[in-house]
């Protein structure tokens, strides 16, 4: 494996190489490559988001984050269908992420929930056909981030331009990297494979209904940063209940641990470098291959931003409450939904047998 090829590995792949190292020299080499990868990734991410902030305004730095997520994911990931159709779908996804979160913010929580359901239905049914590629961690997360950091007026006009540029970049990179791949399925196959009795479709419907419902309830309760609850729910919803229960536990424990670590750093470090706690969290995520540790370090960046608006006590309280609410609601909702679907299937089988 070349140096460049090793740089392309994810955290799990890099750590697997470290475990398999037979000599100290080999282990040190793989560790060096791993650290270079993290440093290069952090530097590139910082530079990329900074460029978007300069071009489209600080309030639109989140656009840089969303575009960066899409570029890094879809340069390798696909939608499982013909490349040309996938490219057009990606362009449509960017239109949805640009327009629908903004419109939903102008509506009441209930009407906003209905619009969010319609928007997520397109993103998930056509962009997240394979749950184990975790495209929802890009598309739905991007949607929720843009929803949570909404802007108006001139700033929204700049957001339109930034998202248009992001769509062009993502579609170009995606098509270039996938144009020579052969896919037997097309858009029509995705529609035909919609089956309410399959674990995939039930998972998709849970994402489509549950995440907007969580946002709506949080907003009706006047809870700031409702997107945190939505992101927590999205992250926890998986096709199998055993996996989902594991994620709920890790999300709750990880967030509480992350909050404690953040508070310790907040009081130990001088106020002039508080903003760098978020960068430290990003490095931690880069070093983490397991979901629980990622939940710990993701807390750093969220709290570093929220503390400026709500103070330490308010930000910490919101983070814990929103995350616990999001994952617990998702677990209860999906448990009931999966149970109802299984009962419906049993009824259909019984009627057919008679």
What are the language-model segments listed below?
Residues 1-137, 141-297, 304-354:
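Alpha-helical transmembrane segments and their membrane-interface boundaries
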